[in-house]
Amino acid sequence: MLQTKPYTFWFITGSQHLYGEDAIEQVRQHSQTMVEKLNKIGELPYTIELKEVLTTPDAIRKMVIAANSDDDCAGMITWMHTFSPAKMWINGLKQLKKPLLHLHTQFNREIPYDDIDMDFMNLNQSAHGDREYGHIGARLNISRKVIVGHWQNNDVQERLGAWMRTAAAFVDGHHLKVARFGDNMREVAVTEGDKVEAQIQFGWSITAFGIGDLVEKMKAVSEDEVRRLFDEYQELYRLSPSILEQDEVKAAVLEQAKMELALKEFLEEGGYTAFTTNFEDLHGMKQLPGLAVQRLMAEGYGFGGEGDWKTAALLRMMKIIADGKGTSFMEDYTYHLAEGNELVLGSHMLEICPTIAANQPEIQVHPLGIGGKEDPARLVFDGADGPALNASLIDLGHRFRLVVNEVEAIKPERDMPKLPVAKVLWKCKPSLSEATEAWIHAGGAHHTVFSFEVTPEQLYDWATLADIEVVFINDKTDVLQFQQQLQWNEAFRRLFK
């Protein structure tokens, strides 16, 4: 898996000097116990780092400035153990640039009915201390996540971990570099976009290269390197018999191995963690990259076909959120419109990530009726079944919109022996007709990121951090109300953003 930095999250507890040093020391000890136990459970994806209890406006301001300037800090987790007058937090929160989570909890799980006294009440005041803190967050209109519940509850820890992944993806996005080999597919609208605005909004740097730059890298790949990678293919995947029996078919696989090695070296040298290709820009190449792209996606790289840099970058973000699992570049390809059993067949020419596979992928070589090149090698498999979603990031000219549709992936009812590509079938929620009407009204693309792992809540959190519009299509969607929501969002974004 292509790793992110070993980010940390700062745990910051608020209080005030009104209660005396003994009370603040207890707050400090409780905070330390919570952080130690949260880190020890091993369920959180990143380490929580305990910071001092904050009791003055100046200490709060300095802590925020320190968090902003620490490249390893991916966010702040804040909690008011006692009452902490929120005017103290104004100057600090106004300067905060990192993701913020408000953990509304308390150290003790239950009220000690027999022993509770006013000392206990004064110490354990998060029930109203966090409301005071929450008010100033609303007054300042600060983007923040709120999680409520006892800190040892499984659901609280799961939501905390999910948010940490999302925050890390957002922060990592400000260092994301996308390499585009060639340009967009000619005359296609939705894959275009304002790359400067994307860098302003998300931090993404998108750079174009001629395909000749990749071809030169391929020329430098040695036969020994290719042979070793082919051996790895044999260990990980099934190989169609023709690959081992026919030299020209095996040569097609070796060509993809050469592409993979060249692509990876190019990306690593430039610090790129996402990339695009285009079947119309393949001068000097024998095949469209297929197997090579699938393998790199499985390592965590973002990818978009036909120059689609927005989907490539979004895939990289969602790979981080999903910890590299069950997430792929996707395209709505064709429909099964049997009444009462409407389905979408999702696929692409070649480039679907094997992390969504239900079975062991098989390397096969077949003609590709587009691009005008030799028969490319690719991984062939059926997608897994289960709850999933499709997400599409589009550029509306004056802003970005994220469109999300929840789906249910299903096992294919029948084999498709003449379709040798990776593919997945799904049912749209609430139905194919309603979901697709809403999708089209929202301007969602035909390219998406498909994921079994990333949740709608995580995508909402990411969009909120990025300050972009996000709309959801799910079981609760009413198409007429959805159209009104789009109109309200348009008015809000034009007037207030």
Curated annotation (Swiss-Prot):
One Pfam short name: AraA_N
Class of this enzyme: isomerase
Gene Ontology terms: cellular component: cytosol
Swiss-Prot/TrEMBL GO biological process terms: L-arabinose catabolic process to xylulose 5-phosphate
Residues reported in the UniProt entry to bind Mn(2+): 306, 331, 348, 447
Cofactor(s) essential for the protein: Mn(2+)
Lipid metabolism listed as a keyword: no
Record Gene3D superfamilies: 3.40.50.10940
CC cofactor note: Binds 1 Mn(2+) ion per subunit.
Free-text function comment from the UniProt entry: Catalyzes the conversion of L-arabinose to L-ribulose.
Family according to the record: Belongs to the arabinose isomerase family.
Protein name (Swiss-Prot/TrEMBL): L-arabinose isomerase
UniProt gene name: araA
